[in-house]
């Protein structure tokens, strides 16, 4: 199956490979984003940490798509108050959702609202690493 990756500016990406995965959905107020948060489709949303420029539109998109947000336990406790499904994990933890496996890995970043981590997502023998450096190993 073909994998399609779209950069949404800043740290935001979509990965489509039979399922639509959205990472760090920051659309509103992002001059580099070419889409509006209201129009974004996602089956699964991954948020690396609680800064507005990473978590910005996660709740809005999750509600529009009835999709869960994968994030740290601490951030999950806040997001749940918005009546959105969350899947919490911490560094080293792996979640599985509709055939997608994402593993949270520790990452260093200044002053995050709550803990932060990046995700390894193996898709068809490809590994995608989302961090402040975007690395795709094929």
Residue spans for each PLM region:
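Active-site beta-strand termini and strand-to-loop segments that position acidic
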Residues: 15-18, 97-98, 127-130, 138
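Short, polar loop motifs at secondary-structure junctions
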Residues: 9-11, 71-77, 91
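Beta-strand-turn-beta hairpins that frame and shape the catalytic cleft
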Residues: 1-3, 16-21, 94-102
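Active-site-proximal loop/helix segment associated with metal-binding centers of metalloenzymes
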Residues: 104-138
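Binuclear metal-ion centers of metallo-dependent hydrolases, dominated by the metallo-beta-lactamase
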Residues: 68, 80-94
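Short internal beta-strands
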Residues: 43, 67-74
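Pre-active-site segment of Zn-dependent metallo-hydrolases
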Residues: 12-51, 56-63, 111-120
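Short active-site oxyanion
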Residues: 4, 63-68
